Amino acid sequence: MMKRENFPVAKIYVPIERRKTLVQARVDEIAASMLKDGQQVPIKVRPDGERFVLIEGLHRLEAAKALGEATVVGYRVDARKH
């Protein structure tokens, strides 16, 4: 079972191809939900040296950034590089 962790937002890298899928309206919806209920669904990241690479949860990560959060809840996963 994966364990929830707090990851520093500043240490999470989002691959360029992934950034192209960002929909600002969705970020705004999630940010509003996070303000009301907190972060409900963790993101997924994989370790990459001193940083982490985002695997899943782009809109949740961007919502946390928009709210000025220093950390985001997530799972550390072992994933292959593409």
PLM-predicted stretches and their roles:
Residues M1-D78:
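Short, charged/polar connector segments at secondary-structure boundaries
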Residues K81-H82:
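Short, charged recognition helix plus adjacent turn
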